[in-house]
């Protein structure tokens, strides 16, 4: 559980001032970008061909809010490749912990919590990848104003993330005007369209300081509370995880509830459902749970992913290894986290942030309509083994958008095998990934990389669409 840092805010403020002053004095010798360059990480027993940078960008100097980032340049042709911002959700979960260390980043962590290995399916093979821990209180991101940690919400997260991007690109001016995309998962289903909307509005009022946003992609993301609940209850019932009675009660008591702020009555039914489901990994229902962790009961009530990993040797306890690694003082030093600014205990998710989340609209579907009209490339993908924001939830939400289909629904292929299913709509592309859980790149890394490459290039995944379309036409003609 992440600790609140309010008790030592004065000390942190003084450290932050000293830290920034030192950085200013070093400006004559090294730019802030050069100071942020990471030379080598503890436990990295191999060389890499790409540069990477990490550090802080202040989003509110008066209150002392600063967000932590980690940039990985593309393996090849970094100067011509697009920039992609990756966001995890929660709310309150770290993009470094999940996105970088478990999913799409190049550096993954072995079971000893000290040694790194290179992810052969890292997304920086195709783009420059920027991980951001937002809002403050998540990961290494901090505020010197203790009340900030209990006043986060969707609105301020979007505002601070936009401020971060505008200031970050001044530090890395080579990315000004570069094609820019936002990708992420889970509660980032709120963050991503909200930040995209903020960027579009900013661009409309600023010619000189615009961000060249081309599109976004959301995986297993919250989109609409009603449809997310509807699809979730249907999914866990259809797989036989809950009883008919509990299914009926969930629909009755929770069907119109907020996804992250449920009523006491709804929570009681969710507790019953959790007991019936048992100790499985609801983020990946067909893989083993981590028995080394505490009981995973009440998973439907928790915001923090208790995830599992498929790698060369299956290890469902990845979160534990990540927590050990990013608490190491030598790791924090390598990532330019001053001792006085580091959390007393770094954690993958912050309970303080999630439990005090202030604003969360019941739906972001209206933003989808706005951004489709703005001409952004929008893809939505879903791992079909996720029982937190399942594929049924996503399909209900997309159906509610009432978009015109442009292609038949059918399988896409990778190496001759079905990778999942897809359908293109006017303004949106929907893709499922077969066998993947809530964190698609974790369980199906090869398929996820193929999906990502297709998205940023704007090319469809390999399908047998023509034969499917022909079959559908024949059926319509026969009827």
Curated annotation (Swiss-Prot):
Instruction: Name the top EC class.
Output: hydrolase
Q: In which tissues is it expressed?
A: Expressed in seedlings, roots, leaves and flowers.
Q: Which GO MF term does the entry hold, naming one?
A: serine-type carboxypeptidase activity
Top-rank taxon, per record: Eukaryota
InterPro entries found in the cross-reference section: AB_hydrolase_fold, Peptidase_S10, Ser_caboxypep_his_AS, Ser_caboxypep_ser_AS
Q: One Pfam family of this protein, by short name?
A: Peptidase_S10
| Keyword hit for Disulfide bond | yes
Provide GO CC annotations from the record: extracellular region; plant-type vacuole
Cysteine pairings via disulfide bonds? 93-349, 254-266, 290-317
> Which terms under GO biological process does the entry name?
proteolysis
Question: What protein am I looking at?
Answer: Serine carboxypeptidase-like 29
Q: Which organism is it from?
A: Arabidopsis thaliana (Mouse-ear cress)
From the broadest rank down, the organism's phylogenetic lineage runs: Eukaryota, Viridiplantae, Streptophyta, Embryophyta, Tracheophyta
């Amino acid at each position: 559980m992440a600790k609140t840092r309010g008790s030592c805010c004065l000390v942190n403020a003084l450290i932050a001032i000293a830290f920034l002053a030192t950085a200013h004095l070093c400006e004559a010798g090294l730019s802030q970008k050069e100071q942020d360059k990471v030379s080598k990480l503890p436990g990295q027993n191999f060389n890499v061909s790409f540069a990477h940078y990490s550090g802080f960008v202040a989003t509110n100097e008066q209150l002392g809010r600063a967000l932590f980032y980690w940039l990985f340049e593309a393996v090849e042709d970094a100067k011509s490749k697009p920039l992609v911002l990756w966001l995890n959700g929660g709310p309150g979960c770290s993009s470094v912990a999940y996105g970088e260390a478990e999913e799409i980043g190049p550096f993954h962590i072995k079971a000893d919590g000290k040694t790194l290995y290179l992810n052969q399916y890292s997304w920086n093979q195709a783009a420059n990848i920027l991980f951001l821990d937002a809002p403050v209180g998540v990961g290494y991101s901090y505020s010197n104003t203790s009340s900030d940690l209990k006043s986060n919400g969707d609105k301020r997260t979007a505002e601070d993330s936009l401020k971060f991007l505008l200031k970050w690109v001044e530090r890395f001016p080579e990315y000004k005007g570069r094609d820019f995309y936002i990708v992420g998962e889970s509660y980032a289903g709120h963050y991503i369209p909200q930040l995209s909307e903020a960027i579009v509005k900013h661009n409309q009022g600023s010619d000189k300081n615009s961000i060249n946003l081309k599109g976004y992609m959301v995986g297993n993301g919250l989109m609409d509370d009603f449809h997310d609940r509807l699809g979730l209850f249907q999914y866990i019932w259809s797989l036989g995880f809950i009883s008919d009675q509990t299914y009926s009660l969930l629909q009755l008591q929770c069907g119109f509830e907020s996804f992250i702020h449920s009523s006491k009555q709804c929570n009681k039914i969710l507790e019953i459902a959790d007991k019936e489901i048992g100790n499985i990994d609801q983020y990946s229902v067909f893989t083993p749970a981590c028995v080394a962790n505490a009981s995973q009961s009440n998973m439907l009530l928790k915001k923090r992913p208790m995830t599992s990993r498929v790698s060369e040797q299956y290890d469902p306890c990845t979160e534990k290894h990540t927590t050990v690694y990013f608490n190491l003082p030598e790791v924090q030093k390598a990532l330019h986290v001053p001792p006085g600014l580091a959390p007393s205990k770094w954690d993958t998710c912050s309970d303080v942030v999630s439990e005090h989340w202030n604003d969360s609209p019941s739906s972001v579907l209206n933003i989808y309509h706005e951004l489709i009209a703005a001409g952004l490339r929008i893809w939505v993908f879903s791992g079909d083994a996720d029982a937190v924001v399942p594929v049924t939830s996503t399909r209900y939400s997309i159906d509610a958008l009432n978009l015109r289909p442009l292609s038949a629904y059918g399988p896409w292929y990778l190496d001759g095998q079905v990778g999942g299913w897809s359908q293109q709509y006017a303004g949106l592309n929907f893709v499922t990934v077969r066998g993947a859980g809530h964190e698609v790149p974790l369980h199906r890394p090869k398929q996820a990389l193929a999906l990502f490459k297709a998205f940023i290039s704007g090319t469809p995944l390999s399908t047998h669409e023509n034969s499917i379309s022909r079959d559908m036409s024949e059926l319509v003609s026969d009827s």
